[in-house]
Amino acid sequence: MLGNETKTQKGTRLIKAAFFDIDGTLLSDKTNHLIPASTKDALVQLRQHGVKCCICSGRPTAQLPWCIKDGFPGFDDAFDAYITMTGSMCYDESGVYADVPIDHEIACRFVKCVEDGMFDALLLNRNGVFCNRRSEKVRELERMVAFEYPVLDFSEALNEPVYQFCAFVSPDEEHEVSDVMSDCIITRWCDLFCDVVPSTSSKPKGIEATLKHLGLSREETIAFGDGGNDATMLAYCEIGVAMGNATDDAKASADYVTTDVDKDGIALALRHYGLID
């Protein structure tokens, strides 16, 4: 099928925007956090066919790998839009078009829990991502994402907007966070920690803001993800694709399950829908 028309059981559609999670979707843990060659080729083709390629991640800008921020040969202008911090900040080359910080009182409540020793955490603001201390759980995440978090006094950080917290609690311990942060959305993509974002923020809301900014509709979208925090995004977009290495809830929310990130998953799915040659 030519161009970016795709025909499925739901009919013929014109896909004009593709949204990609980063960890486990674009980047592989098995290849030193690099984008597989087949995915690079697929992204180049997708853009050549007129499809906007957008990032939709829990990561902040400061934690985006160079290949995501700056692009790569054949994909030199980087991505067309960046939905970061689980939808709390969205921007493109023209600037920030969506900015949703956590309410100050709610942020203070979370920091009090950290100071009381309930759990360790990360704090995400415009300047970067910081930890309250470099505990073993923090170091484990650093190894997973190839990034070292600077230590910051969270109380001092409250002088400016906070967009997301990450609480180092297991799924069984998650109630320790939800009990005191019931007015926030709590998601996770691994067992090590959960993300805490404003109730007015999410990956789908970030996509909605991006579509409005680009002048596109929800019916013109495809999304790729692998984590539990991608499930709502996969359900929201016209076509949701879960990676073969995805969590069960991500797969349940998807229209199509492709192969693993390391097994040409993105390229195979785009080819399945006729979006690349």
Regions found by a protein language model. Give the residues of each.
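Short active-site oxyanion
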Residues: 50-54, 79, 162-164, 219-221, ...
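Conserved acidic, metal-coordinating active-site core of Asp-based
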Residues: 107-109, 113-233, 245
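Short, hinge-like loop/turn segments at secondary-structure boundaries
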Residues: 70-74, 98-101, 138-142, 205, ...
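Mg2+-dependent phosphoryl-transfer enzymes with acidic/Ser/Thr/Gly-rich catalytic loops
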Residues: 12-17, 36, 196-277
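Short, structured coil segments at secondary-structure junctions
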Residues: 78, 86, 180-183, 236-237, ...
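Asp-based phosphoryl-transfer active-site loop
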Residues: 16-31
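Non-catalytic pre-domain segments flanking phosphatase-related domains
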Residues: 1-20, 38-44, 48, 216
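Active-site phosphate-binding/coordination module
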Residues: 37-137
